[in-house]
UniProtKB/Swiss-Prot annotation:
Transmembrane segments: none annotated. Belongs to the class I-like SAM-binding methyltransferase superfamily. rRNA adenine N(6)-methyltransferase family. RsmA subfamily. It is found in: Cytoplasm. It comes from Geobacillus sp. (strain WCH70). Keywords: Cytoplasm, Methyltransferase, RNA-binding, rRNA processing, S-adenosyl-L-methionine, Transferase. It catalyses: adenosine(1518)/adenosine(1519) in 16S rRNA + 4 S-adenosyl-L-methionine = N(6)-dimethyladenosine(1518)/N(6)-dimethyladenosine(1519) in 16S rRNA + 4 S-adenosyl-L-homocysteine + 4 H(+). GO terms for cellular component: cytosol. The keyword Transport does not apply. This is Ribosomal RNA small subunit methyltransferase A. It is an enzyme of class 2 (transferase). Its EC number is 2.1.1.182. Specifically dimethylates two adjacent adenosines (A1518 and A1519) in the loop of a conserved hairpin near the 3'-end of 16S rRNA in the 30S particle. May play a critical role in biogenesis of 30S subunits.
Length: 291
C-alpha cells in the first residue's frame, strides 16, 4: 500500500518539493486527514465496477482513495500548476485520468461515454472549490448525466441549504432545486482544522442520490423554477408580493395571481419559505394557465 497523501507531513513535503503556493481565487484547501477521506469514499458506496468523477483533485489526496476502490477515476483540474504534481503523486495508479479543464465548460456526457465505456455505475465524489459549489452541482444535475449521484464536500452553510426543509431559515430556491432532482442528506460535518490552508468556515459532506422521477409533477420545469425563484426573491415579503414583483407581467396580473393562490389553498399572506415543493408545483401548474 502506498503512503497516503492526506497527512500533514506528506502534504507539506509535496508542496515544498514543488514550491506550490495556494491560489485563493481557486478556493484551494487541501484535506490532511486520511480517515475523513476514507469515510467520504465509503459514503459513495463504490465498487470495482464504478466509474468515479472528481472535481478539483488538488494534489491527489482523495483521488488516490477513489483509485483504490473504483474501476476508473476521471478528475477535472483547472490549475495547470497541479498537473505535474498529480502525475507524480498518482504515478502508482493506472486507473486515473486527469483532464485539465474547467468542469463548468466541459462536455461531461462525452467524457463519460469515452472514459467509462461499459460502466453503468458512475458517481461524482469531490471536495468542491467553495467559490463555485452551487454552479457545479446544478450543472451536474441539469445536464441529465447518467450518474447515480454525488458525494461532495462543501461549506457547511451551503450543505445546510441544500438539505433544508420548509419553514426553516436555510430553506430556499436552492433547496427545492436540489431536492427536485435528488434525495439529499448531510452525512458528515468536517472541521476547518483538517485543511491546509485552514478555511474560515467548517465543511460538510452531502450525499445526493439522483431521483428516477421528480417527487412532484410539473407541466413546465423552467416555469416551475421561475415561480420558485420569484417566491424567494425577498424573504420577508409575502408570496403574493414576491410573485407580483418578480414574475413577468406580475404587476398587471395581480388579481389573477391572488385568485390562483386562493384556488390552490395557499394563503397569499404566507412567505415563500413556508411552502412545500408540492405546493409550489400546484401553484406553478395553475399560474401557467393565467400568465
Amino acid at each position: 500500500m502506498n503512503k497516503d497523501i492526506a497527512t500533514p507531513g506528506r502534504t507539506r513535503e509535496i508542496l515544498e518539493k514543488y514550491g506550490f503556493s495556494f491560489k485563493k481565487s481557486l478556493g484551494q484547501n487541501f484535506l490532511i486527514d486520511t480517515n475523513i477521506l476514507r469515510k467520504i469514499v465509503d459514503f459513495a458506496e463504490l465498487s470495482d465496477e464504478t466509474g468515479a468523477i472528481e472535481i478539483g483533485p488538488g494534489i491527489g489526496a482523495l483521488t488516490e482513495q477513489l483509485a483504490r476502490r473504483a474501476k476508473k477515476v476521471v478528475a477535472f483540474e483547472i490549475d495547470q500548476r497541479l498537473l505535474p504534481i498529480l502525475e507524480d503523486t498518482l504515478s502508482p495508479y493506472g486507473n486515473i485520468r486527469i483532464i485539465h479543464q474547467d468542469v463548468l465548460k466541459a462536455d461531461i456526457h462525452r467524457v463519460i461515454s469515452e472514459e467509462f465505456t461499459g460502466m453503468t455505475d458512475i458517481m461524482v465524489v469531490a471536495n468542491l472549490p467553495y467559490y463555485v459549489t452551487t454552479p457545479i452541482i446544478m450543472k451536474l444535475l441539469t445536464d441529465r448525466l447518467p450518474i447515480r449521484g454525488m458525494v461532495v464536500m462543501l461549506q457547511k452553510e451551503v450543505a445546510d441549504r441544500l438539505a433544508a426543509k420548509p419553514g426553516t431559515k436555510d430553506y430556499g430556491s436552492l433547496s427545492i432545486a436540489i431536492q427536485y432532482y435528488t434525495e439529499a442528506e448531510t452525512v458528515m460535518t468536517v472541521p476547518r482544522t483538517v485543511f491546509i490552508p485552514q478555511p474560515n468556515v467548517d465543511s460538510a459532506v452531502i450525499r445526493l442520490i439522483k431521483r428516477k422521477q421528480p417527487p412532484v409533477k410539473v407541466e413546465d420545469e423552467a416555469f416551475f423554477f421561475q415561480v420558485v425563484r420569484a417566491s424567494f426573491a425577498q424573504r420577508r415579503k409575502t408570496i403574493l408580493n414576491n410573485l407580483v414583483n418578480n414574475l413577468p407581467n406580475g404587476k398587471a396580473m395581480k388579481e389573477q395571481i391572488e385568485r390562483v393562490l386562493t384556488e390552490t389553498d395557499i394563503d397569499p399572506r404566507r412567505r415563500g419559505e413556508t411552502l412545500t415543493m408540492e405546493e409550489f408545483a400546484a401553484l406553478s401548474n395553475a399560474l401557467q394557465h393565467v400568465l
